Amino acid sequence: MNVYDSAHNLSKAIKESEAYKDYADAKENLESNKSLNESFLDFKRRETDLRVSMLSGKEPDENEMEILNKLFEVLSKDPLCSEYYRAEGRYRQLLDDLSKILAEAMQI
């Protein structure tokens, strides 16, 4: 079997999985609410900035941590956001599992 054909079959299977469909639906629902989506994107940007800063060896800014915690608390109470987080988690788990399978196959 051709490796590229297998990769395309895997891609198709992922797109047909419940985890992917739920994630795509949750993402679309979140994006349909402009103000909520803007708040969500702001949270994600701040979270990424904080992680990059911490990875470069800087201590986390306490004020920024507090802002992030409050934003997360507010966002997680919204049904669209909480469903997005759940769906994203399931989808990430699927991708992580597939990555582990591929990594095991590459062990020499």
Spell out what each predicted region is.
Residues 1-108:
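Terminal, compositionally biased segments used for targeting/anchoring and flexible tails
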